[in-house]
Amino acid sequence: MKFSKMLTAVTEILNQDSDTQVDVCLTSQMASAIELWTAMYENHAPWVDRKKVKSAQIPAAIASEIARLVTLEMQSEITGGEAAAYLNQEYQRKVLLDLRRYVEYGCAKGGLILKPYMTKTGLAVQYVQADSFFPLSFDDSGRILQCVFTEQFRKGKKIYTRLEVHTLRNDMIHITNRVFVATNDYSLGTEIEVSSVDRWSELVPELSLAGSDRLLFGYFKVPMANAEDTDSPLGVSVYSRADELIAEADQRYSNICWEYEGTQLAVHIAESLLKYNTDQNKFEYPGGKERLYRRVSYATGATDKPFIDVFSPAIRDTALFNGFNAQLRLIEFSCNLAYGTLSDPQNVDKTATEIKVSKQRSYTFVSDTQMALQRALEDLVYAMNFWAALYGLIPPGNDYQVSFVWDDSIIVDAEEERQTDRQDVAMGVMSLAEYRSKWYGETLEEAAKNLPEPALVEE
């Protein structure tokens, strides 16, 4: 079921009961936008028909690059008391190991929920993409107060749907599971018992938990103003402001593809010069090169038109590539990417100052995204700690700390900075100990001890 249809169905179900009536903050306008961003990321944009308009796969490239920059050389760990060792082991193995891929999904679709849950073997983490959850309400700090998660599968002619509703009310977390079965995609169908579906038979219909001041998941959203719906607290795709620019870029890319296809070398050859194979009911081409030759019927003699004519027009690739490259630069600006990220870096006709400004713009956005991801991961670890303590895997309490180290190489060229520091040492404005401490990861005391002895000069 499409995301916008699912939103309507979920709202209708919740509003049937006075106890669950909601004023959904996720509007149909935002639902349609999320559908578009998802289609663009999955290479199914509405303007792409695979014939006249091909996809240059720009949305996926943008989301992938931003996710790479955000998680580049990222370091994070959980330290502290007795619980920290267990939490950190699960955190490193089940969260950080494959985090970049899920951050890419979040960047593409505007948001991502990181939701821990308990299994028979311990903690697990579910990554819910923006087209599979429905935030119903938020608090003033931007944390979700109520959210619906959906899961759906087909079995024969029946469609099974599970709604998992998380609500924070009066310092209590309420989790409910409701299951529906239908025979079409137009509605969720009839509600049935949760235990009647094998896949969900171990889930409880209702659960209430005390001792948490937030819902038990982390919510990552792209830190951009929502230009699609300025009243919505939801995140937007990293390419949300470039959909029309990307559509034009796909058109220009398609023109380039057609230029190469339409100007392929060909030989127009008269039918009279070809041998006709009666057994196969077709003409035979010299050397079997059907792609090279194009059969032509001439109604006039050879004096008016040669029997063999070579078709080899000039390719206008330079002009077309320049136009495509210019479009990519517009996309880079709209998506907070430095010039040369998507476009040809050799053709970036910018001054050193302009290039630095574009890198600074990208760095600022990446830094904001890193902080948004950090908040989501902190909430995730809080939820992991809650579940692990609830099931007796660790002692109760919050005796842990989460640390983060983010890379800044997007704006700082390490080799260039190192060369500058060497010049400062030569001028005497930076000591050798300071240089060694900075570049060798030593304290000033260690660096001073490790400096080479000055060479003895004989008089």
Where do the model's predicted regions map?
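Extended, charged amphipathic alpha-helical segments
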Residues: 198-354, 401, 405
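Amphipathic alpha-helical protein-protein interaction segments
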Residues: 104, 110-115, 424, 430-439
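Extended, regular secondary-structure scaffolds
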Residues: 108, 113-236
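Extended, non-catalytic structural segments that build the interaction scaffolds
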Residues: 31-53, 298-334, 350-373, 401-434, ...
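Alpha-helix capping/termination and helix-coil
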Residues: 328, 332-339, 366, 370-392
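Extended, helix-rich architectural segments
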Residues: 1-145, 154, 158
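Long, highly charged low-complexity segments enriched in Glu/Asp and Lys/Arg with interspersed Ser/Thr
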Residues: 439-459
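Active/binding-pocket-proximal capping segment
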Residues: 331, 345-352, 376, 383, ...
